[in-house]
């Protein structure tokens, strides 16, 4: 399971994202650019230039027609995937930390940062797909009370928005009114770093700086399963479609690690059994924390965006899922 090492960024990766078919991988970074790669061989297909700050988040629609990005230059941009043309740029008072397409590809949700006297906000824009002009004003704006939102996603059938917050809170919001429908505040006790939906959006997984990941029901926000890592502050967690496993990764901040050993910094990617809540294997990471994990939509492999500036493209082999899901007496096995 040796990865293909993709070198196309000069600074740390912030997010990696597959398209729906899994033949393309998008990566964004602190070097202001977005790259798109072929997943079967790791060849770079193109680059999207236009942002003037760290690109924090990227998402692509289900038809691979439009891509959206959010940046520290206080702008969100809509791109045509096939040509690299920027179709629209929206300006905001603060940085955009997360962008997310709706299930029906007609809306984009984004989270803006709380900074310089500006409240953190969640906005929803309706996207014109027929070639006409894009709206300047959002369909919905609301300011989460209390802890600021870090991540956002649409729930099943786009009925609600789900947000993860700085204090570990997870909340459900009415997509039409912006009213809070439900919230859970005690499950995570640290900043929520990532939130990824299942394929049908009926459940989702979160990762947190409190060294845990949680599996939630999208409708009720009830915690279905919990995965507590004793060592690693987590930056990302992702479910493997069609398999009862999830991947999670993170690591100590690079500057806090006294040696370059991946083991010393806990940079390995951990595979857990979703049902039994058991760690089954570890996969060697890079020379620094894992900042983002994305899994192929068909469960064929996964991609890692690292603090070291590389994208690592892994393809699962036939032995990957033969690890004992529970009852093992030894340490989880380590895969190359």
From Swiss-Prot:
Residues that span the membrane, as ranges: none
Localization annotation: Cytoplasm
Record Pfam families: EIF3I (PF24805)
SMART domains in UniProt: WD40
Keyword list, A-Z: Cytoplasm, Initiation factor, Protein biosynthesis, Repeat, WD repeat
Superkingdom of origin: Eukaryota
Chief place of localization: cytoplasm
WD repeats: 8-49, 50-91, 93-135, 144-183, 187-226, 285-324
Listed CDD domains: WD40
Single GO MF descriptor: translation initiation factor activity
GO cellular component, as recorded: eukaryotic 43S preinitiation complex; eukaryotic 48S preinitiation complex; eukaryotic translation initiation factor 3 complex, eIF3e; eukaryotic translation initiation factor 3 complex, eIF3m; nuclear periphery
Record GO biological process: cytoplasmic translational initiation; formation of cytoplasmic translation initiation complex
InterPro entries recorded: eIF3i (IPR027525), WD40/YVTN_repeat-like_dom_sf (IPR015943), WD40_repeat_CS (IPR019775), WD40_repeat_dom_sf (IPR036322), WD40_rpt (IPR001680)
Family: Belongs to the eIF-3 subunit I family.
Subunit composition and interactions: Component of the eukaryotic translation initiation factor 3 (eIF-3) complex.
Purpose: Component of the eukaryotic translation initiation factor 3 (eIF-3) complex, which is involved in protein synthesis of a specialized repertoire of mRNAs and, together with other initiation factors, stimulates binding of mRNA and methionyl-tRNAi to the 40S ribosome. The eIF-3 complex specifically targets and initiates translation of a subset of mRNAs involved in cell proliferation.
Full protein name: Eukaryotic translation initiation factor 3 subunit I
Gene: TIF34
């Amino acid at each position: 399971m040796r990865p293909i090492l993709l070198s196309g960024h000069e600074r740390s990766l912030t997010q990696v994202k597959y398209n729906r078919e899994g033949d393309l991988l998008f990566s964004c970074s602190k070097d202001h650019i977005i790259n798109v790669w072929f997943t079967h061989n790791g060849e770079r297909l193109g680059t999207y230039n236009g942002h003037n700050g760290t690109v924090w988040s990227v998402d692509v629609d289900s038809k691979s027609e439009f891509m959206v990005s959010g940046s520290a230059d206080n702008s969100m941009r809509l791109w045509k995937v096939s040509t690299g043309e920027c179709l629209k740029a929206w300006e905001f008072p603060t940085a955009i930390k997360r962008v997310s397409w709706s299930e029906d590809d007609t809306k984009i949700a984004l989270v803006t940062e709380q900074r310089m006297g500006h409240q953190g906000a969640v906005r929803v824009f309706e996207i014109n797909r027929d070639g006409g002009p894009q709206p300047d004003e959002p369909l919905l704006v609301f300011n989460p009370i209390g802890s600021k939102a870090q991540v956002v996603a649409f729930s099943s059938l786009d009925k609600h928005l789900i947000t993860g917050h700085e204090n570990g809170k997870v909340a459900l919001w009415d997509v039409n009114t912006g009213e809070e429908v439900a919230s859970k505040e005690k499950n995570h006790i640290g900043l929520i770093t990532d939130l990824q939906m299942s394929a049908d959006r009926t459940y989702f997984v979160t990762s947190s700086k409190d060294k845990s990941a949680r599996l939630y029901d999208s409708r009720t926000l009830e915690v279905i399963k919990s995965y507590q890592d004793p060592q690693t502050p987590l930056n990302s967690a992702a479910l493997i479609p069609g398999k009862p496993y999830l991947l999670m990764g993170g690591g100590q901040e690079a500057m806090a690690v006294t040696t370059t050993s991946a083991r010393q910094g806990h940079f390995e990617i951990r595979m857990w059994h979703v049902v039994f809540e058991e760690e089954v294997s570890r996969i060697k990471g890079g020379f620094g924390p894992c900042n983002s994990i994305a899994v192929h939509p068909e469960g064929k492999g996964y991609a890692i965006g690292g603090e070291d500036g590389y994208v690592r493209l892994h393809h699962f082999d036939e032995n990957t899922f033969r690890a004992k899901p529970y009852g093992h007496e030894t340490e989880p096995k380590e895969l190359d």
